[in-house]
């Protein structure tokens, strides 16, 4: 998970790595780019999970999102990393039991996230 700083409110929020799709990017290419920008890490064995509509609080307002969710494996991840995204304060592996209380998503998105994480264990 990544801890981000809202540019307007300066509030710290936890999220999964992600963000917008740039022009001519596929959702998968965008997911790989966002993971690297926000954690400094790359992953392999990517698989599409689902698409979800939700609102995400950012920059002092609720932003409507159409999320393309993927799972991936991150082999050989160390604690050293370079974060490229200026809004990301830190990244961390969070114990599964703490994910729901930390995620800044709406309840239905938190539930789906936990569902997919449990399926991966």
Where are these regions (language model features)?
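N-terminal strand-loop-strand
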Residues: 1-16
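Detector for methionine-enriched segments
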Residues: 1-4, 62, 120
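Unchanged
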Residues: 21-107
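Charged phosphate-binding loop/patch that engages nucleotide di/tri-phosphates or the phosphate backbone
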Residues: 101, 105-121
């Amino acid at each position: 998970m990544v801890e981000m700083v809202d540019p307007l409110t300066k509030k710290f929020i936890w999220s999964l790595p992600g963000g917008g799709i740039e022009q001519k990017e596929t959702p998968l290419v965008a997911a790989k780019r966002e993971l690297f920008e926000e954690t400094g890490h790359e992953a392999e064995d990517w698989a599409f999970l689902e698409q979800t509509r939700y609102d995400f609080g950012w920059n002092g307002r609720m932003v409507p999102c159409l999320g393309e969710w993927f799972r991936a494996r991150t082999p050989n991840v160390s604690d050293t990393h370079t974060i490229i995204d200026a809004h990301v304060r830190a990244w961390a592996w969070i114990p599964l039991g703490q994910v729901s209380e930390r995620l800044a998503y709406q309840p239905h998105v938190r539930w789906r996230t936990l569902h997919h994480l449990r399926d991966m264990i």
